[in-house]
């Protein structure tokens, strides 16, 4: 995210560099606690080298917390409501996501009336 809070979207050439890796992204099964549903997304390690440097936290060298538009731009596909909340620092290619438990049911009730 830029300093203005606006997501930093990929350029066409940046997106093109990531294309070969998209089919190799692995999604864990979902797991939950009383409040949230979780899953982790594992990027191919080589993909990290193709991601623009401003997507990384300069202090840790890991990906920073990305906004939805940013992680979707990397090729991560998930249903609505997921937010990236952490990078697994020992394995920086593993991104952690969460969403409110029962999000889909609540969302469909709001839309359906």
Curated annotation (Swiss-Prot):
GO BP: any one term: regulation of mitotic cell cycle
Pfam families in the cross-refs: CKS
Translocase found in the keyword field: no
Entry annotated with the keyword Cell division: yes
Intrachain disulfide bonds: none
Keyword field: Cell cycle, Cell division
Example of a GO cellular component annotation carried by this entry: cyclin-dependent protein kinase holoenzyme complex
PROSITE patterns per the UniProt record, alphabetical: CKS_1, CKS_2
A molecular function GO annotation: protein-containing complex binding
InterPro entries: Cyclin-dep_kinase_reg-sub, Cyclin-dep_kinase_reg-sub_sf
Oligomer and partners: Homodimer (in presence of zinc).
Stated role: Binds to the catalytic subunit of the cyclin dependent kinase (cdc2) and is essential for its biological function.
Family: Belongs to the CKS family.
Name used for this protein in its record: Cyclin-dependent kinases regulatory subunit
Species name: Schizosaccharomyces pombe (strain 972 / ATCC 24843) (Fission yeast)
Lineage: Eukaryota, Fungi, Dikarya, Ascomycota, Taphrinomycotina
């Amino acid at each position: 995210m830029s300093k203005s809070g606006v997501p930093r979207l990929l350029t066409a050439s940046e997106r093109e560099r990531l294309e070969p890796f998209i089919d190799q992204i692995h999604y864990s099964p979902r797991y939950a606690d009383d409040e949230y549903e979780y899953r982790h997304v594992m990027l191919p390690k080589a993909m990290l080298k193709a991601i623009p440097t401003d997507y990384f936290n300069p202090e840790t060298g890991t990906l920073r917390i990305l906004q939805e538009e940013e992680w979707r731009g990397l090729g991560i596909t998930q249903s609505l409501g997921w937010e990236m909340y952490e990078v697994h620092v020992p394995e920086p290619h593993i991104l952690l996501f969460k969403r409110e438990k029962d999000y889909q049911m609540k969302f469909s009730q709001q839309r359906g009336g």
